[in-house]
Design a protein with these regions (language model features):
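Metallo-beta-lactamase
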Residues: 93-94, 117, 124-213
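Conserved beta-strand hairpin/beta-sheet module of binuclear metal-dependent hydrolase folds
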Residues: 1-46, 139-151
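A generic local structural motif
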Residues: 14-17, 39-42, 63-65, 113-114, ...
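Short Gly/Pro-enriched turn/cap motifs at secondary-structure boundaries
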Residues: 7-9, 107-109, 129-131
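Active-site HxH/HxHxD metal-binding segment of metal-dependent hydrolases
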Residues: 35-119, 123, 204-211
Length: 214
């Protein structure tokens, strides 16, 4: 059985997801953005064995703890798409600029493409390429449980910023329409910040994209 616990990290309250198989206790962390000690305590308290660190994109609040945890646990870093390499290359510089602790460098072991499938136990997670917030942003969809991890593409009542280097508003809107709004309305999603929502709710009420499903 798939289990999920959201652990907010960093001063930006980024929603890191601890996802695990309740039978095997094998786990992944999606967007381990910071506060490595907090994440380690959560993993230890639940008796989990982390198998990989997945990334939706390369921003510091999503990737800040990845270098440290990958090294400590000897696990691979999977994602995002290679177009976000420049963000990961700059993670120490950007962290210093924002007054964040300087993280360890992030080395990606497997870049992702849309259409690939990641596995955790018996569960499959479809990788969907959703650029716009960043050029290499990916999202993860678990059809079996109707769960989607949108990173900073789509939020409850909002969408991702596109005023960062290589952000693109039109591309973001297209990504939301193509990769999020094509999913069933009852799909629940976990975004990078804020509360969960459903695809159907955002189609109807999100002021930035409502009515743009087709």
């Amino acid at each position: 059985m798939l289990q999920v616990k959201i652990v907010p990290v960093t001063a930006f309250a980024q929603n890191c997801s601890l996802v695990w198989d309740s039978e095997t206790k094998e786990a992944v962390l999606i967007d381990a953005g910071g506060d490595a000690s907090v994440l380690k305590k959560e993993v230890e308290a639940l008796g989990l064995k982390v198998k990989a660190l997945w990334l939706t994109h390369g921003h510091l609040d999503h990737a800040g703890a990845v270098g440290e945890l990958a090294k400590e646990w000897s696990v691979p870093v999977i994602g995002p798409h290679k177009e976000d390499q420049f963000w990961l290359d700059m993670i120490q510089e950007v962290s210093a600029r924002y007054g964040f602790p300087i993280p360890q460098p992030v080395k990606v072991d497997q870049w992702l493409e849309g259409g690939e499938v990641l596995k955790l136990g018996e569960d499959e997670f479809e990788v969907r390429f959703a650029p716009g917030h960043t050029p290499g942003h990916v999202i993860f969809y678990n059809k079996n449980h109707g769960l989607l991890w949108t990173g900073d593409v789509l939020f409850k009542g909002s969408i991702g910023r596109t005023d960062f280097p290589r952000g693109n508003h039109e591309q973001l809107i297209e990504s939301i329409k193509r990769e999020c709004f094509s999913l069933p309305d009852d799909t629940q999603f976990i975004s990078g910040h804020g509360p969960m929502s459903t695809i159907g709710y955002e189609k109807q009420f999100n002021p930035f994209v409502a009515g743009k499903a087709g």
